[in-house]
Amino acid sequence: MGAAVTLNRINIASGIADIRDKYMELGFNYPKYNRTVKFAEESYMYYYETSPGEIKPKFCLIDGMSIDHCSSFIVPEFAKQYVLIHGEPCSSFKFRPGTLIYYQNEVTPEYIKDLKHATDYIASGQRCHFIKKDYLLGDSDSVAKCCSKTNTKHCPKIFNNNYKTEHCDDFMTGFCRNDPGNPNCLEWLRVKRKPAMSTYSDICSKHMDARYCSEFIRIIRPDYFTFGDTALYVFCNDHKGNRNCWCANYPKSNSGDKYLGPRVCWLHECTDESRDRKWLYYNQDVQRTRCKYVGCTINVNSLALKNSQAELTSNCTRTTSTVGDIHPGEPVVKDKIKLPTWLGAAITLVVISVIFYFISIYSRPKIKTNDINVRRR
């Protein structure tokens, strides 16, 4: 039977390129669980910028810590030119508060979150982040120029990072409602930020026949298909007479009872005319990939009737290959990391031991004894 996973050693090694960086080597009795966690302990006094207009000390400010810890790493004369903003999420060791754990290799935010008892030793926080006062955008015109990429020459990085952060979401929501086909709006959508997908879901629920809605459906499937299904449902519910909607919202009719299989495989609006997947719900899109289309033609040059009977034979199954759609993909489901547990193994060991004990008792040979006759007078 296996033994429990135990921590045998912890070694702290200093970095070579940067003395602030350190490596915590965790050694277990099973080598496959060994990990090296890189972290930083800030010790510099900043009088320079880590990037244009920004200073980001290697310090994780966890709950309960004063923000004065962040300003303690900047020289007073230099600090007057900067202001502290909401930094990126980070993790820190509770027994060494302020340390900044690097996310790399197997060590990710999801890995730390899913670790059993991780919150007993690791705390979440915000990294110290300063921006030069001259880089703060104090008016809507400056935000518009940066987020719409009209003029990004003097834009801070948080407003000029290809929409990777939330800083342009408010502006882009209003901007893209007025111009949803704008290339910058489609770039914002391709990042798959929730505000962008929600905005286009609302837009396409009124204008699903627009070209940009085809791109919208392509981007959100398969992981965020509900945004597209909602838009299609609302649009087709408001436009029941639109033939493009007849696959998703087919008019009530008894003709469907004459065919076998889902209508997405045989209905004219689902196959021949409506090749754009935006007119299908996601489950219909998946279903259509399982439909096999066979095209057959019969050319008659002359026709001779005998006894009023005519036979037409189509040789479609010999030379014609079936054609189907490409599968749109499956949504990604992230499973939680399962750490090894020995509770089940321990219970099994106890049960087996008890069984063997009773077997050994009852399998021993009987001890011979003399019969004793007892008679009562």
Curated annotation (Swiss-Prot):
Pfam families in the record: Pox_G9-A16 (PF03003)
Lipid moiety-binding region (N-myristoyl glycine): 2
Highest taxon in the source lineage: Viruses
Keywords, comma-separated and alphabetical: ATP-binding, Disulfide bond, DNA-binding, Fusion of virus membrane with host membrane, Helicase, Hydrolase, Late protein, Lipoprotein, Membrane, Myristate, Nucleotide-binding, Phosphoprotein, Signal-anchor, Transcription, Transcription regulation, Transcription termination, Transmembrane, Transmembrane helix, Viral envelope protein, Viral penetration into host cytoplasm, Virion, Virus entry into host cell
GO cellular component, one term: membrane
Virion surface side: 2-341
Biological process, per Gene Ontology: DNA-templated transcription termination; membrane fusion involved in viral entry into host cell; symbiont entry into host cell
Intravirion side: 363-377
GO function terms (MF aspect): ATP binding; DNA binding; helicase activity; hydrolase activity
Post-translational modification: Most cysteines are linked by disulfide bonds. They are created by the viral disulfide bond formation pathway, a poxvirus-specific redox pathway that operates on the cytoplasmic side of the MV membranes.
Cell compartment(s), UniProt: Virion membrane
Stretches that traverse the bilayer: 342-362
Induction: Expressed in the late phase of the viral replicative cycle.
Membrane topology: Single-pass type II membrane protein
Family note: Belongs to the orthopoxvirus OPG143 family.
Role of this protein: Envelope protein part of the entry-fusion complex responsible for the virus membrane fusion with host cell membrane during virus entry. Also plays a role in cell-cell fusion (syncytium formation).
Binding partners and assembly: Part of a stable entry-fusion complex (EFC) which is at least composed of proteins OPG143, OPG147, OPG155, OPG086, OPG094, OPG107, OPG104, and OPG099. Formation of the viral membrane is necessary for the assembly of the complex. Interacts with OPG094. Interacts with OPG153.
Protein name: Virion membrane protein OPG143
